[in-house]
From Swiss-Prot:
GO terms for cellular component: nucleus. Residues 1025-1040 have a biased composition (Polar residues). Zn(2+) 3 binds at C728, C731, H744, C749. The gene is ush. Zn(2+) 2 binds at C343, C346, H359, C364. This is Zinc finger protein ush. Keywords: DNA-binding, Metal-binding, Nucleus, Phosphoprotein, Repeat, Repressor, Transcription, Transcription regulation, Zinc, Zinc-finger. Residues 254-266, 509-523, 602-613, 620-635 have a biased composition (Low complexity). InterPro entries: FOG, ZF_CCHC_FOG, Znf_C2H2_sf, Znf_C2H2_type. GO terms for molecular function: DNA binding; DNA-binding transcription repressor activity; RNA polymerase II-specific DNA-binding transcription factor binding; zinc ion binding. SUPFAM superfamilies: beta-beta-alpha zinc fingers (SSF57667). The lineage of its organism: Eukaryota, Metazoa, Ecdysozoa, Arthropoda, Hexapoda.
Length: 1191
């Protein structure tokens, strides 16, 4: 009775406050009509509640006196402080007092009944600052029925005149209701109930305070939100337990009684009391804890509040009013309406159905894992024992039948009848699993890809949908055999039915017994994920796996489906063999596979692992081999799928490769190679045609290599598998022979300066004869056997297009699919015996010929004509665009080539083998080498004419350059290590690769002789080399096997007109010869060596000849800069050079016009005795050669 009276008092107070809040605003005529109608309804409710308890006023008068004493001081101060306050502040004060009373009464009514005041006593206290002097007459009124009648007009009048200063004295007189202290004595209660009253006044000022946190709030809704979401002391289990009790019907009491039953601490009763006082809108799902807020909300609908209808029954049930004659079906309808706009996953209520749909489509937390359009059925918590309890369906049915006894959130989560049926079927299946733990429920395996396994119990709740489905996906091949799923209102394809012929290969490999078949079907995690509505596109990303390279354009949709279906079936079969499957509990141990365990399995069937992680290899045998057919096998394989494929032979799991070192180091590659070889053998194509030696075609086109042979392989980027017994970790090179590895570590490794040659990987040395196969073999069948028997320790995967090496297959696939500059357009040809420079073969740099070829083979003959080289070598010249001259690695860009050359730390410079030009960059050397050829063609392979200068070569050079003959350091350095065509001086040991330099040298150093063309034939050069031991020392290393390569080098136009003399009186007169840039003069020695210069035995012979020769020599030397080693055609050009550009710019350029004594001494001395040796014919020839040298 006390609880019902308390509800009546709270509703009276709430209705009075509603009137005050309405009258405190400017109301229209329609609002006034609403007020009158609401007042009439409240009067009827008050009369009914007061007639039930006529003694309510006499029970709690003493307690009301105490409360009045507490409120007395603030009420005295209010008229003075709030003199200038507007109507809004009055309304806020009324609302605050109303909320305080609503908070106190339901919480204290079960424990302390005398503290619940009656409605006639609360009315003047709440309206005390604005009540007229006649208000105290209503407080001692014993009969409750006449009290509300004169109350409303006075309240309305005082609310409008609250700011009138003329009524302040009256308001002060009314703040002293001393007469109420003389009310009849209250009902005496035991002392045990009066003890909590001592602590109550301390808690009253913080009526909206979170006790654990100590934070006060201005409204109970804010406090409730804080306690539900933000409070650090909230206990989720307690809240769920409270909702479970209310859902299962365990407490059978109302919200007010539940607050008293769960007492023990003061916080839970406050929460339960607030959750029960919700004012719900009759036209939408809006609810508020204050009726004032609900009235404001009702104005949005622009309709007057009608009488309580069936749609308003939930709000009446929350307020404690029991409407008569209510059937449960309309209640379910109203709850389903609220469920349509309530998201149970996020616990958010929406006012608009459009907002709700937008939330479910874009923002809901369930769209990724489940994507359901309806809320989750909370049936299992109601049973209290999990999903496997037998009472799950009972709890669901009770929850659906009595939504009025639930809290608002629990009531809004009430499932629909279809959801109840599905949950009941699932609970029945779980109960049957618990009843018979060793017997498994029957499942239905649908012949789709992926295979969908559905429990038979779910068929009971299935419904029939006639006609075609309105799907926007027009790209579906066979819509009549496609399974769909509804995801956020859109229909998406889930699985596709398999063709009947493709199901035949699965039967021989399936287990024979029915128990093993049931175990294989229920073990994989895939079917339950499909049952829960998870598609492959909406599944969360599993970062523990790496997806296989995307080859959407390689195969058609049907071919991929057939292949993946076979792989999925193979995964089911191999699941019983492999142990340690993550998060999957197989029924072999006696346990049951619950839906929770299956859903939480992390592995994705559509993304086989491509990483060489040992953990993934040990967990799943399919992690390496499952994706091999889709990424490695040829497309023509699907032609013979129905009757030829046996997946177990195509996927020899870890137990089949236990003896192989390849399986131990990288079983992923072994499985892929074995799968590709077996696929080629099944397809009926020869291994040499479909799989070239040491190469694997990638599936990037929809061609048929089984029928096309090598022609189809030429259109696809290939992979060269280089396998060996040793690997240099610093240079990332795999060696087929251990001897080559030792030679590399001793002579060529970039880390040989830090590590000694003895620190080698001895444990990696396996028999070189076994590792000599180096690939898949000649045929595919031999390749499959070699994968299992060849004990190779290392393998490298080389991109055939650009030559970059990789140790992981997925990295190589990603490179070929996205980054390879030549993989998309032009594929590299297969390795043939006629191509010795193919990257698939192990090559080393030969110390004799300085070229890359296989160790043990004779040095290749030099190319006679570089322009004809492309006709001999079918390999495109673009493959060697950035080829490393040291190790032969081809880089796609110049920047990568430069970075690669940094690995070879001992390479100091590069030298042109044609002219001995030395450069520091590869790009500059390639540009320089192209200047030697007439045509600027792209067929020139610059690496053939480029050699490297190593650090040890420079140190050896410094020792060899000390010669007793005084030869030039530049000459000795230039002629080292390079097989090139040289031009020799006939009278000394001067050698140069430019003919003009030799002519200039002969003119300057030997002007006494008739200057002929220098010796350019190899025979003449060999004689000169033999006559000079110092030059022979360097040139022996240049010529390999007694052969000197000949080059087609562009010739300079050196034939001048014979009638033009070199020396002119007027230096400004033009010379009728082509202007060609003069080459630097390489002076062999400051003075001609003794024995080669003719002795000056004759005095002045022919004075005219001597004078002419001396004048010519002086004229030539007048235009020669010895500092920069440049000769000029004109004196003015020479003077400008000396003044502005010379390294040694003197103050007076004229002082340097005379020839240098060092260079002229020999010439003058020779000129003094030249008359007796040279005749008239020699003088004429000398002039022509001087003119040629000057040019």
């Amino acid at each position: 009775m006390l609880s019902s009276n308390t509800r009546g008092d709270c509703s009276d107070t709430a209705e009075e406050m509603t009137v005050d809040s309405r009258d405190s605003k400017d109301l229209s005529a329609q609002d006034i009509g609403e007020q009158k109608q609401q007042q009439m309804e409240d009067q009827l409710e008050d009369q009914l509640n007061d007639s039930r308890d006529p003694q309510n006023n006499n029970n709690n008068i003493d307690d009301d006196a105490d409360e009045d004493a507490e409120f007395e001081e603030p009420e005295k101060a209010n008229p003075q402080q709030d003199q200038d306050l507007g109507e809004t502040e009055m309304e806020q004060e009324h609302d605050l007092q109303q909320e305080d009373l609503q908070q106190e009464l339901p919480a204290n009514s079960p424990s302390t009944p005398p503290r619940s005041p009656s409605s006639p006593q609360l009315i003047p206290k709440l309206e005390q600052p604005a009540t007229p002097p006649s208000e105290p007459e209503a407080s001692p009124c014993p009969s409750p029925s006449p009290c509300p009648t004169p109350k409303y007009p006075k309240v309305r009048l005082n609310a409008l005149l609250a700011s009138d200063p003329a009524l302040k004295p009256d308001a002060k007189e009314l703040t002293l209701p001393d007469s109420r202290l003389l009310a009849p004595p209250p009902l005496v209660k035991p002392d045990t109930q009066a003890q909590p009253e001592v602590a109550e006044p301390l808690l009253k000022p913080a009526r909206f305070m979170c006790l654990p946190c100590g934070i006060a709030f201005s409204s109970p809704s804010t406090l409730e939100a804080h306690q539900a979401y933000y409070c650090s002391h909230r206990i989720k289990d307690t809240d769920e337990a409270g909702s479970d009790k209310s859902g299962a019907g365990g407490s059978g009491a109302t919200a007010g009684d539940a607050a008293g039953l769960t007492g023990g601490s003061t916080e839970p009763p406050a929460k339960m009391a607030r959750t029960g006082k919700q004012y719900g809108c009759t036209q939408c799902s809006y609810s508020a804890d204050k009726k004032v807020s609900l009235n404001r909300h009702m104005r949005m609908h622009q309709t007057s509040p009608a009488a309580p209808t069936l749609a308003g029954l939930p709000s009446l049930l929350q307020n404690g009013i029991a409407p008569p004659g209510v059937t449960p079906n309309p209640m379910e309808d109203s709850s389903s309406q609220q469920t349509d706009r309530y998201c149970s996953h996020c616990d958010i209520r929406f006012n608009n159905i459009k907002t709700y749909r937008a939330h479910k489509q874009h923002y809901c937390s369930s769209r990724r894992p489940e994507g359901q359009l309806t809320p989750k059925p909370d049936a299992s918590p109601g049973a209290g024992s999990g999903p496997g309890s037998a009472g799950g369906s009972i709890g669901v049915s009770a929850q659906a039948a009595t939504p009025g006894k639930l809290s608002p959130q629990a009531r809004n989560k009430t499932p629909t009848p279809a959801m109840v049926a599905v949950a009941a079927a699932a609970a029945a299946a779980a109960a049957s699993l618990q009843a018979t733990p060793h017997s498994h429920p029957p499942f239905l395996a649908l012949p789709t890809h992926p295979i969908i396994i559905v429990p038979c119990s779910l068929i009971r709740a299935a419904s029939f949908i006639p006609g075609p489905l309105p799907t926007p996906n027009s790209g579906i091949v066979n819509p009549e055999t496609t399974c769909f799923t509804v995801d956020n209102g859109t229909i998406k394809p889930l699985a596709t039915a398999l063709v009947g012929a493709t199901l035949e290969p699965e039967r021989p490999s399936a287990p024979s017994s029915a128990a093993e078949a049931t175990e294989a079907k229920s073990s994989p995690p895939e079917p339950k994920r499909k049952e829960a509505g998870l598609t492959r596109e909406s599944a969360p990303l599993d970062l523990s796996l790496r997806r296989s390279p995307i080859t959407l354009n390689s195969l058609s949709l049907r071919q991929r489906q057939l292949r993946n279906a076979l792989l999925d079936v193979e995964e089911v079969l191999l699941a019983g063999v492999g142990t340690g499957k993550e998060n999957v509990e197989t029924p072999r141990g006696g346990g049951s596979v619950t839906p929770e365990q299956i859903v939480c399995a992390p592995s994705l069937p559509s993304s086989p692992s491509m990483s060489p992680s040992p953990k993934r290899r040990a967990i799943s045998p399919r992690s390496s081999g499952a994706g091999s057919a889709s990424s490695m096998s040829p497309p023509g394989l699907n032609v013979a799928v129905p009757h030829l494929l046996d997946m177990r032979s195509m996927l020899p799991a870890d137990f089949g490769l236990s003896e192989s070192l390849l399986a131990k180091t990288n079983p992923e590659l072994a499985l892929k190679l074995a799968a590709a070889a077996a696929a080629a053998a099944v397809a009926g194509s020869s291994g040499a045609a479909a799989f070239p030696p040491a190469s694997l075609p990638a599936q990037t086109s929809s061609g048929n290599p089984g029928s096309g042979g090598s022609a189809g392989g030429a259109q696809q980027p290939q992979i060269y598998v280089k396998k060996g017994v040793s690997k240099c970790m610093e240079c990332n090179i795999v060696f087929c022979k251990y001897e080559n590895y030792l030679a590399h570590k001793q002579h060529y490794c970039s880390a040989r300066s830090q590590e000694g040659a003895s620190e080698v990987d001895v444990k990696s040395a396996v028999s070189p004869s076994i590792a000599g196969a180096g690939g898949l073999g000649a045929g595919a069948a031999e390749a499959a056997s070699s994968v299992e028997t060849t004990p190779v320790a290392y393998q490298q995967l080389i991109c055939a297009a650009c030559g970059i090496k990789y140790t992981s297959l997925d990295n190589l696939r990603a490179h070929q699919n996205y980054y390879c500059p030549k993989g998309g357009a032009v594929a590299a040809p297969a390795a043939t015996p006629t191509d010795p420079g193919q990257l698939g073969m192990p090559k080393e740099k030969c110390g004799k010929c300085k070229t890359l070829h296989e160790i043990g083979l004779p040095c290749p003959p030099p190319v006679a004509n570089p322009l004809a080289a492309p006709t001999v070598n079918p390999q495109p010249a673009t493959n060697s665009l950035n080829k490393c001259p040291v190790c032969g690695v081809v880089s796609p860009t110049a920047a990568l080539a430069k970075k690669h050359m940094e690995m070879h730390g001992t390479v100091k410079a590069y030298r042109c083998s044609i002219c001995q030009y030395k450069g520091n960059t590869l790009r500059g050397m390639r540009t320089h080498i192209r200047t030697h050829f007439d045509k600027k063609t792209s067929d020139v392979n610059e690496e053939l004419y480029m050699t490297c200068i190593f650090e040890e070569d420079a140190s050896a050079l410094s020792q060899e350059l000390v010669t007793p003959t005084g030869a030039s350091t530049t000459t000795g350095h230039d002629s080292m290590d390079h097989p090139s065509q040289m031009f020799n001086c006939d009278y000394c040991n001067y050698v140069s690769t430019y003919k003009g330099n030799v002519l200039r040298h002969m003119k300057l150093m030997h002007p006494h002789v008739a200057i002929n063309s220098p010796s350019i034939s190899p025979d003449t050069r060999d004689q000169d080399v033999t006559s000079n031991p110092t030059t022979n020392q360097h040139s022996n290393s240049d010529v390999s096997n007694g052969e000197a390569p000949s080059f087609h080098i562009k010739s300079e136009p050196l034939d001048p007109p014979p009638t033009v003399n070199l020396v002119h009186e007027n230096n400004n007169s033009p010379i009728a010869t082509p202007h060609i840039k003069a080459e630097p003069i390489e002076v062999g020695a400051d003075a001609a060596p003794g024995g080669l210069v003719p002795p000056m035995t004759s005095p002045l012979g022919n004075s005219s000849s001597v004078a002419a020769a001396a004048a010519a020599a002086a004229e030539v030397m007048k235009k020669y800069c010895s500092t920069c080693d440049i000769s000029f055609n004109y004196v003015k050009t020479y003077l400008a050079h000396k003044q502005f550009y010379c390294k040694n710019k003197p103050i007076r350029p004229e002082a340097s016009d005379s020839p240098s004594p060092n260079h002229l001494g020999g010439g003058v001395a020779v000129g003094l005795g030249i008359g007796g040796l040279v005749g008239g014919h020699g003088q004429q020839k000398n002039k022509e050669n001087l003119q040629e040298a000057a040019i």
